[in-house]
């Protein structure tokens, strides 16, 4: 996921730090040292990450737009000027703007805020922003929570004792709370020095920027792979005591299925699957950035000569038009597939399904899927002209039924008019009349629209009084009976008000023959 590094360049960051030796350091130098360490790590282990650099004091400035060139980011660190007072709110507004312009509101993003814990003074300070948080309108809302999925990591160029001597730590913790609790505050353990700054940024790297390495297995074939971006733990909301589910480092392929059968399923996240080549000594090659082009070319040549199952799988899925179902954990599956990046380039991707025994209803339970050879006859037909999917559900789903929709008044009016039209054609339309009447009755009970039942009952009684002398005698009996049944249902308390109860035609001497047909 993209990263925005937000660097504090206010005057408070120029405060000197007493470090052993003759060279004098400022807090901004310690911050730049820590960020250099972070950028070097990402250049080696997280080089697909897009990163932007923002500096701020009372205003904010985008120093480096989203890039994968970490040399540019490191150069920008040495070219930062010093400005005036701290205004964290303006920096957070800037982060919102640049992320939404580049990635929209759906892509998760990590924000690394580097500051010394000084909150600013007067209007625009973090204290003032938090104090007026509940008094704002929609036009000038506080930028947290971010309008996109995010994690906010605050790197403080101060130790815990210094922050606790004021209310700085409480205010910074409030920022994490406002971001829905997504994020963490890091402080320097012990005195301010380069070693302790490295230790603090090392904790951030371990938490958020450690590459996810796994072993992809299919039978006796295996391949070491990196999954990018790193899969996040998934929490099932329905559980009473939810425990985050983490995918296994052993990704075992359990089967293959046609792309047409799996279609475009709902997924939690999508990830690149990159092969990690190993030389004879067991060291990784081809995954990092080397300083010398010749060394890099020779490493790539070595990696290209070693057979790799990941490459074989990618090519096979692309040619055969299939996807591989992969086991991520207990009752948790995903799929591996080839996705075209351009006309000539494609990538091996992995999508994660929701945990559960039946993540895709049209495939049924994953444990019940098996090879074609186990079937008595080929489920795809001899000419590959049919498919066993989608499985037909035992119970009709709600969207497969003729549901009653009364979003607009015209829908309700149409249903009532249909009943009245059939009422005027009784007894010939007895079956249709009661079918439409019961449909309206069930919908009214489901919506709690009991007044509608009484209103339709009054209409039917009125229709009964307007029957011509030439009308069949059975029509009056049926209308009166239907009106009485609706009035009983409109009370909501009688046995006739049950949802599953149906109004049946009244048995009369005139309707005997028609009742038998019904």
Curated annotation (Swiss-Prot):
Family matches, as Pfam families: IntS14_b-barrel (PF19435), IntS14_C (PF20504), VWA_2 (PF13519)
N6-acetyllysine: modified positions: 418
GO BP: any one term: snRNA 3'-end processing
Ranges annotated as spanning the membrane: none
InterPro entries linked: INTS14 (IPR039841), IntS14_b-barrel (IPR045814), IntS14_C (IPR046471), VWF_A (IPR002035), vWFA_dom_sf (IPR036465)
Residue ranges of domain VWFA in the record: 2-204
A single cellular component GO annotation: integrator complex
Complex and partners: Component of the Integrator complex, composed of core subunits INTS1, INTS2, INTS3, INTS4, INTS5, INTS6, INTS7, INTS8, INTS9/RC74, INTS10, INTS11/CPSF3L, INTS12, INTS13, INTS14 and INTS15. The core complex associates with protein phosphatase 2A subunits PPP2CA and PPP2R1A, to form the Integrator-PP2A (INTAC) complex. INTS14 is part of the tail subcomplex, composed of INTS10, INTS13, INTS14 and INTS15.
Name recorded for this polypeptide: Integrator complex subunit 14
Organism: Bos taurus
């Amino acid at each position: 996921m993209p990263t925005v590094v937000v660097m504090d360049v206010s005057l408070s960051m120029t405060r000197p730090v007493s470090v052993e030796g003759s060279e004098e350091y400022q807090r901004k130098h310690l911050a730049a040292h820590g960020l250099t360490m972070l950028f070097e790590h990402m250049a080696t282990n997280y080089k697909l990450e897009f990163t932007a650099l923002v500096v701020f004091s009372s205003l904010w400035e985008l120093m480096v737009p989203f890039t994968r060139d970490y040399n540019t980011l490191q150069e920008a660190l040495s070219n930062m000027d010093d400005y005036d007072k701290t205004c964290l709110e303006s920096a957070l507004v800037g982060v919102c703007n640049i992320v939404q312009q580049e990635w929209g509101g759906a892509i998760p993003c990590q924000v690394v805020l580097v500051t010394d814990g000084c909150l600013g003074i007067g209007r625009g300070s973090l204290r003032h922003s938090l104090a007026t948080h509940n008094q704002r309108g929609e036009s000038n809302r506080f930028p947290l929570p971010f309008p996109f999925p995010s994690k906010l990591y605050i790197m403080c160029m101060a130790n815990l004792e210094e922050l606790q001597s004021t209310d700085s730590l409480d205010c910074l913790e409030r920022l994490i709370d406002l971001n829905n609790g997504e994020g963490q505050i890091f402080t320097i353990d012990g005195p301010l020095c380069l070693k302790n700054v490295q230790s603090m940024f090392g904790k951030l790297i371990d938490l958020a920027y450690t590459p996810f390495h796994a072993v992809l297995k299919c039978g006796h074939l295996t391949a070491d792979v990196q999954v990018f971006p790193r899969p996040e733990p998934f929490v099932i909301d329905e559980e009473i005591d939810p425990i985050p589910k983490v995918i296994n480092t052993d990704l075992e392929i359990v089967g293959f299925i046609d792309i047409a059968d799996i279609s475009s399923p709902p997924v939690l996240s999508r990830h690149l699957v990159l092969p990690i080549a190993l030389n004879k000594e067991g060291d990784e090659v081809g995954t990092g950035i080397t300083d010398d082009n010749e060394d890099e070319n020779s490493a790539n040549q070595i990696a290209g000569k070693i057979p790799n199952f990941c490459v074989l799988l990618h090519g096979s899925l692309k040619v055969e038009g299939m996807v591989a179902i992969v086991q991520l954990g207990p009752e948790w599956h995903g799929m591996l597939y080839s996705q075209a990046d351009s006309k000539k380039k494609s990538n091996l991707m992995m999508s994660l399904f929701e945990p559960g025994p039946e993540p895709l209803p049209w495939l049924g339970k994953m444990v019940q899927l098996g090879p074609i050879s186990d079937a008595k006859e080929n489920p795809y037909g001899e000419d590959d002209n049919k498919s066993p999917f989608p499985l037909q559900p035992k119970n009709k789903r709600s969207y497969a039924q003729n549901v009653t929709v009364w979003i607009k008044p015209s829908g309700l009016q149409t249903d009532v008019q249909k009943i009245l039209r059939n009422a005027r054609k009784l007894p010939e339309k007895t079956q249709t009349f009661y079918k439409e009447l019961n449909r309206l009755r069930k919908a009214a009970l489901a919506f709690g629209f009991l007044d509608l039942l009484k209103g339709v009952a009054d209409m039917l009684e009125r229709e009964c009084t307007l029957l011509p002398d030439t009308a069949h005698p059975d029509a009056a009996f049926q209308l009166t009976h239907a009106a009485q049944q609706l009035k009983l249902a409109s009370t909501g308390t009688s046995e006739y008000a049950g949802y599953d109860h149906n109004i049946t035609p009244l048995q009369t001497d005139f309707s005997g023959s028609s009742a038998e047909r019904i």
